[in-house]
C-alpha cells in the first residue's frame, strides 16, 4: 500500500495572505498531476461530522483552534490518504519519489522533552507540518486514538510536561496533546508500527540549520501563528527557557553522533533508560 498522489491543506478561509498563496502554488506547480484538496473552517467541520461523527465531540472539545486543525489533518489523511502541508511549507522539488512509501514524516528537531529522553531514549521529534500516508494507515490510527486519549485523560498527557515550569505548561499543551510531542510519543510507544514509517532525517541532526525541513524536498517557514496569545514577557520567557533547556541537552545529543535511525531509536526505547 502506497501514498496516493493527493495534497491536502487547510486554513480558516480561502482569503489567503500572499505568502500562503505562494506556498500553495509551489506545491501545485511542482506536483501538477496530484489532486489538490483545500478545506476552510466550514469544510473542516463538515468533513469531521460526515466522516468521523464518533469523534465530533472530541474535535469540538479542544480549546485551541490549532488542536482542531491538528486533529483534522490526521483524520483527513487517514481517511483519504495523501500528503498534508501547512500553509507555510515551501517545496523545492516534487513529491513523486515519496509515493512508494506507506507513511512518511519529517524530522523536526532535537528535543529537550524529558519524558521522551528518559522514558524512551529519544532525543528527537517528528513534525506534523508536512506528512503523508496511505489511507487507513495504522500509525495514523494510533495517533488519532492518542489525540482522543489526550483530550479525555489530561493526566496521560501531563507526563509530557515533566520538567517544564508550571507557568509555561500551557504553552506546550498543543505540542503534547495533538502536535509533535504526541506524534513522537505515539511512535516511541508503538515500536511494532515503526517499520512501516519513514522519517526524513537530515545528514546532521545536531545542525539546527537542517531542522524543520521536509527531507531535501522542502522547508517549513515556522510562522508559529498557532502560538497562544499572551504578554510579550511571557512569550519571551517561554522562548528563553526552551532555548536553555535544549542547550542543556545538546551536549548529550552530540555525543550520540550526527545521525539517527528510527529502528535503533525505537529499539533503544524498549529497554530501560537511565534518568
Range-by-range predicted roles:
Residues 1-69, 85-275:
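Glycosyltransferase-associated regions of secretory-pathway enzymes
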Residues 70-82:
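Small-residue hinge/turn detector
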Amino acid at each position: 500500500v502506497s501514498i496516493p498522489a493527493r495534497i491536502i491543506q487547510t486554513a480558516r478561509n480561502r482569503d489567503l495572505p500572499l505568502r500562503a498563496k505562494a506556498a500553495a502554488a509551489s506545491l501545485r506547480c511542482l506536483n501538477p498531476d496530484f489532486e489538490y484538496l483545500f478545506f476552510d473552517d466550514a469544510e473542516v467541520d463538515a468533513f469531521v461530522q460526515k466522516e468521523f461523527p464518533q469523534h465530533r465531540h472530541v474535535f469540538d472539545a479542544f480549546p485551541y483552534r490549532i488542536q482542531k486543525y491538528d486533529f483534522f489533518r490526521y483524520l483527513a489523511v487517514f481517511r483519504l490518504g495523501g500528503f498534508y502541508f501547512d500553509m507555510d511549507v515551501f517545496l523545492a522539488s516534487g513529491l513523486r519519489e515519496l509515493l512508494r512509501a506507506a507513511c512518511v514524516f519529517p524530522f523536526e528537531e532535537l528535543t529537550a522533552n524529558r519524558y521522551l529522553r528518559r522514558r524512551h531514549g529519544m532525543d528527537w521529534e517528528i513534525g506534523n507540518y508536512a506528512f503523508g500516508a496511505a489511507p487507513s494507515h495504522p500509525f495514523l490510527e494510533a495517533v488519532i486514538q492518542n489525540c482522543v486519549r489526550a483530550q479525555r485523560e489530561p493526566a496521560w498527557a501531563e507526563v509530557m510536561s515533566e520538567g517544564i515550569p508550571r507557568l509555561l505548561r500551557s504553552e506546550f499543551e498543543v505540542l503534547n496533546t495533538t502536535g509533535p510531542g504526541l506524534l513522537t510519543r505515539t511512535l516511541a510507544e508503538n515500536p511494532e508500527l515503526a517499520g512501516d514509517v519513514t522519517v526524513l532525517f537530515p545528514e546532521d541532526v545536531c545542525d539546527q540549520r537542517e531542522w524543520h525541513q521536509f527531507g531535501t524536498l522542502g522547508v517549513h517557514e515556522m510562522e508559529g501563528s498557532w502560538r497562544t496569545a499572551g504578554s510579550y514577557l511571557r512569550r519571551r520567557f517561554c522562548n528563553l527557557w526552551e532555548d536553555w533547556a535544549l542547550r542543556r541537552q545538546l551536549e548529550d545529543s552530540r555525543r550520540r553522533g550526527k545521525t539517527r535511525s528510527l529502528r535503533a531509536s525505537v529499539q533503544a526505547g524498549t529497554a530501560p533508560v537511565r534518568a
